[in-house]
Amino acid sequence: MGLSDEEWKKVVDIWGKVEPDLPSHGQEVIIRMFQNHPETQDRFAKFKNLKTLDEMKNSEDLKKHGTTVLTALGRILKQKGHHEAEIAPLAQTHANTHKIPIKYLEFICEVIVGVIAEKHSADFGADSQEAMRKALELFRNDMASRYKELGFQG
């Protein structure tokens, strides 16, 4: 299920538009995930008590976490599928420490595509969106494989 060179170029090119403003993109991704899938918010002790959109938008911790998530994802995407070195420690912490189900990775990946589509509509057409979805599916599948190796049934 690999991506073609052309698809990877689309992924890396759009990520180049996202990177200059990771805090804003990351914050929007986390907020939208919590709004669309409220059960995900319960996994975050720091964010459990943020009840309103204003509270979420004003949380520096939430913005920092969103930045951390997208920074890690950017490193993975830039590896164009050769991301084992980045995936291994991420799977370890997400399986053993945070206990994040793969389903939640599906949720956040779809939110990421939606946020990029809104913020960069002129540069993120259907073909680029499909390439990003394929890249994110590859990431999730590799995380799921690592989870299995670690004995986590997430």
UniProtKB/Swiss-Prot annotation:
Keyword flag Transmembrane helix: no
Pfam families for this protein: Globin
GO molecular function term, any single one: oxygen carrier activity
This protein's GO CC annotations: extracellular exosome; sarcoplasm
UniProt binding sites for heme b: 94
Positions contributing to nitrite binding: 65
Record-annotated Globin domain positions: 2-148
Binding residues for O2: 65
BP-aspect Gene Ontology terms: removal of superoxide radicals
InterPro entries: Globin (IPR000971), Globin-like_sf (IPR009050), Myoglobin (IPR002335)
EC number: 1.7.-.-, 1.11.1.-
Annotated Gene3D superfamilies: 6.10.140.2100, 6.10.140.2110
CDD domains assigned: Mb
Keyword annotations of the record: Cytoplasm, Heme, Iron, Metal-binding, Muscle protein, Oxidoreductase, Oxygen transport, Transport
Domain of life where this protein originates: Eukaryota
UniProt enzyme class: oxidoreductase
Catalytic reaction equation(s): Fe(III)-heme b-[protein] + nitric oxide + H2O = Fe(II)-heme b-[protein] + nitrite + 2 H(+); H2O2 + AH2 = A + 2 H2O
Subcellular location: Cytoplasm, Sarcoplasm
Subunit structure: Monomeric.
Family assignment from sequence similarity: Belongs to the globin family.
UniProt name for this protein: Myoglobin
Species of provenance: Varanus varius
Organism phylogeny: Eukaryota, Metazoa, Chordata, Craniata, Vertebrata
GN (gene name): MB
